[in-house]
Amino acid sequence: AAAGGGRDREGAPCLYATMSQQADNFFVLQIDPKTGATRQFSVDVPESNYTTAVYMGRDGRLYIGAAHSGHLFCFDPAADGLLDLGQINGDAAIFPCRIDEDGKGRLWIGSYGTADLSSYDLRTREFVRYGRMDETDMYNYPLVNADGTVACFIAQTLLHVVVFDPQTERRQTV
């Protein structure tokens, strides 16, 4: 589960919590901090059981990567619901490990399965898939640097960092 602060459709402060479960898909709780009242939102995409990566965007939307469907979802307060933004990277991304945002309004998503890296442009609503960041390991946890490069923390067999430059698409192990 993950939690964070945000706004509801009326612009009032609220809390968001994601809840994972084995028997069904994940859901999001919207919590009124004054009254404790909750509202629950679910997704319909099969095998979206776990919220393995959650990010509160600068746009006030909650972005959620789901295992085992490998889909990116968005809780949009204005739409008052969960939106399916699509599959992150087919079978290469069984579940996302981490989501971060750059200064250009792109979400960077590292996934388990192939330690792949994908971006999702919030303006154009399109994914770009950059492939594996490591040929052996399977987990990728990206962090966007101030200069726009993406530091991919690669795990589990041999912990290391691969720096990816989106401008040149060059990868460098550091």
Task: Identify the meaning behind each predicted range.
Residues 1-26:
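Beta-strand-rich domains and repeat architectures in extracellular enzymes and scaffolds
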Residues 32-36, 76-80, 121-125, 165-169:
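Short loop/turn segments that connect beta-strands within beta-propeller blades
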Residues 1-7, 48-55, 93-99, 137-144:
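Repeated scaffold domains used in trafficking and secretory/extracellular systems
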Residues 14-18, 61-64, 106-109, 150-153:
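Conserved beta-propeller blade signature
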Residues 20-22, 67, 112, 155-157:
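Short loop/turn segments immediately following the C-termini of beta-strands
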Residues 62, 75, 82-85, 107, ...:
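Fold-core signature of tandem repeat domains
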Residues 27-29, 71-73, 116-118, 160-162:
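A short loop-to-beta-strand structural motif that recurs across blades of beta-propeller domains
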Residues 42-47, 86-91, 130-135, 174:
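Surface loop/turn motifs at the tips and blade-to-blade linkers of beta-strand repeat domains
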